[in-house]
Each structure stands twice: as structure tokens, then as C-alpha cells.
Curated annotation (Swiss-Prot):
Residues 3-166 form the N-acetyltransferase domain. It comes from Pseudomonas paraeruginosa (strain DSM 24068 / PA7). Keywords: Acyltransferase, Transferase. Homodimer. The keyword DNA repair does not apply. Signal peptide: none annotated. This is L-methionine sulfoximine/L-methionine sulfone acetyltransferase. PROSITE patterns: GNAT.
Length: 172
């Protein structure tokens, strides 16, 4: 798959919205049940920009969004600065082509460049592809929480994975 990874722009929001709403309606990757509108994604985009956090997109030669990735604060308390939670979503017809790896690798590089310390992934425990992707890039399972969510008429379990971006770094 020939795709370029780049910073997202406002023009990418309709493509991001379509991928997001597909995940809402058809997967357990997002635990929301109600699709969102473009204003919601614009507010999310603006919030990431204010916080200095990236939104990356994988796009084809025509600029069409094939996937996206981002991170934001893990928790809103000062003691968690340096730790972010990330998301990676790939368009349904593009899954299994390596875009998730490309997006997550680029996101890890960006987090390291920003001097962050830990990246956290919160993954529905049945999502073997996402767990495998994260393991491949060095993430380790750090916890599991059974039946903490629900969607599609069933309980969902949550697996936490994390990557220490600089294990030799001293505490501040």
C-alpha cells in the first residue's frame, strides 16, 4: 500500500468523520453508539491543536484519508503529564495493508520528539489485530478490566497496553 503519513488538515475532517462513524456503528474499537457530526470532529481537531497534540492521516496519492491516528492527555491531572492515550483507526477497506503500523510508528516518533514518556492504548480485549499491532511495536499489556463497557448487547472487556518511550529517562 502506497500511502503517505502527514499532519491532518481541516480538509481531512470529512474522511476522518467517515472512519470514526464507521467504527462507532460497526466495531467495538470506539465504545460510543451514536454517530457524530462534522462539528464534533472540528471541535476535537481544534482541541488537539490547542494542546499541541498531533493528528496524523494516512492518505493516498489523491489525498483521500485512509486512516488516522492521534493522542491526547491520559488523565487531566498534572501528575500524568508525559503520559498520553492514543488512537489509530484505518478505513474498513484498507485494514490489513500495513497502514496501522505506519500510523502508529509515526505517532510514536512524534511522541518521542515531544519528549513524552509513556503511550497508553485502551483496546477492547477481543480486538486481536490491534493487540497484535501494539505488541509488534513494543507495547506490553499492563492491565485488563473485564465487563467495564457494553455495546451491541454484550459486555466489553478492556485491555490496557503501554509503551515506555524512554525507559532510561530519570524522573523529573
Amino acid at each position: 500500500m502506497s500511502a503517505s503519513i502527514r499532519d491532518a488538515g481541516v480538509a481531512d475532517l470529512p474522511g476522518i468523520l467517515a472512519i470514526y462513524n464507521d467504527a462507532v456503528g460497526n466495531t467495538t474499537a470506539i465504545w460510543n453508539e451514536t454517530p457524530v457530526d462534522l462539528a464534533n470532529r472540528q471541535a476535537w481537531f481544534d482541541a488537539r491543536a490547542r494542546q499541541g497534540y498531533p493528528i496524523l492521516v494516512a492518505s493516498d496519492a489523491a489525498g483521500e484519508v485512509l486512516g488516522y491516528a492521534s493522542y491526547g492527555d491520559w488523565r487531566p491531572f498534572e501528575g500524568f503529564r508525559g503520559t498520553v492515550e492514543h488512537s489509530v483507526y484505518v478505513r474498513d477497506d484498507q485494514r490489513g495493508k500495513g497502514l496501522g503500523v505506519q500510523l502508529l510508528q509515526a505517532l510514536i516518533e512524534r511522541a518521542r520528539a515531544q519528549g513524552l514518556h509513556v503511550m497508553v492504548a485502551a483496546i477492547e480485549s477481543g480486538n486481536a489485530a490491534s493487540i497484535g499491532l501494539h505488541r509488534r511495536l513494543g507495547f506490553e499489556i499492563s492491565g485488563q478490566m473485564p465487563q467495564v463497557g457494553q455495546k451491541f448487547g454484550r459486555w466489553l472487556d478492556l485491555t490496557f497496553m503501554q509503551l515506555n518511550l524512554d525507559p532510561t529517562r530519570s524522573a523529573p
